[in-house]
């Protein structure tokens, strides 16, 4: 019984911190700052992407659906909801990634592509 109470307490503490982190990303912005790596040339490019506008990086097309960041008084964090498509001439459009990317943890939800990597740097006002 004592273990069950301890487990319940630990779960409650975890949920309290987790829910606070989710709600702290409260400032919505209109532009995401992204970086892309071309693995063939080893070149890193930094580019801005406005909400719901297509931005090209190599054969990729990146669309930012939402970009949020924490208020200045909290630990810095930015997250963007992205849709990344691969556009190859003469082939159908392929959606490579749809989901949230976090600036502090780019490997948490990474896009898989043999030539390119894309990650979030931050959200701009």
Labelled PLM ranges:
Residues 2-7, 11, 20-125:
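N- and C-terminal low-complexity/disordered segments
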């Amino acid at each position: 019984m004592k273990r069950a109470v301890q487990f319940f307490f630990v779960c409650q503490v975890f949920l309290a911190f987790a829910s606070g982190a989710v709600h702290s990303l409260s400032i919505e912005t209109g532009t995401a700052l992204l970086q892309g790596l071309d693995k063939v040339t080893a070149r890193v490019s930094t580019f801005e992407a406005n909400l719901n506008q297509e931005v090209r990086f190599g054969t990729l097309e990146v669309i930012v659906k939402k970009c949020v960041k924490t208020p200045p008084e909290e630990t810095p964090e930015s997250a963007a909801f992205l849709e990344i498509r691969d556009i190859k001439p003469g082939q159908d459009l392929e959606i490579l990634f749809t989901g949230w990317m976090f600036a502090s943890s780019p490997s948490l939800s990474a896009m898989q592509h043999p030539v390119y990597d894309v990650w979030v740097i931050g959200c701009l006002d």
